[in-house]
């Protein structure tokens, strides 16, 4: 819900090409993978020691697993991690665990909102907000 509301609002600012996050040098192209890190550095973060763009993915992955609610396979599919087992990789489809992933992403958005008010661990938040029950 939260992401759709934000993206819908941002879409009104999109140019003719329909991109919401346009590149700084060419508005016809999307932002690069380095844009988030540059923004963090502008805000005063050391992207080699404190936080980096990829670190947000690692944080989300760890928190989702720590909550104990979601299967590792669903988390891995959501993060688009590559399967290390070659045989298994041949049978994995990107569309796996779609319903669980939908619930997981809504739980993640709600978890982030809850942490605006007061810091709470993923494990503790899962006790009071379990969409699987």
Regions inferred by a protein language model and the residue ranges of each:
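Short, glycine/charged-enriched secondary-structure capping and boundary segments
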Residues: 70, 90-91
């Amino acid at each position: 819900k939260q992401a759709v509301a934000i993206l819908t609002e941002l879409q009104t600012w999109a140019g003719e090409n329909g991109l919401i996050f346009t590149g700084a040098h060419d508005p016809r192209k999307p932002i690069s993978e380095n844009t988030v890190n540059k923004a963090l550095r502008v805000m005063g973060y050391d992207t080699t020691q404190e936080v980096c763009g990829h670190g947000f993915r690692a944080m989300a992955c760890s928190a989702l697993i720590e909550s104990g609610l979601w299967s590792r396979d669903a988390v891995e599919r959501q993060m688009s991690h590559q399967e290390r087992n070659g045989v298994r990789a041949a049978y994995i489809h990107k569309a796996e665990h779609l319903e669980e992933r939908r619930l997981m992403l809504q739980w993640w958005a709600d978890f982030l909102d809850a942490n605006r008010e007061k810091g709470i661990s993923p494990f503790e938040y899962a006790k009071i907000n379990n969409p699987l029950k």
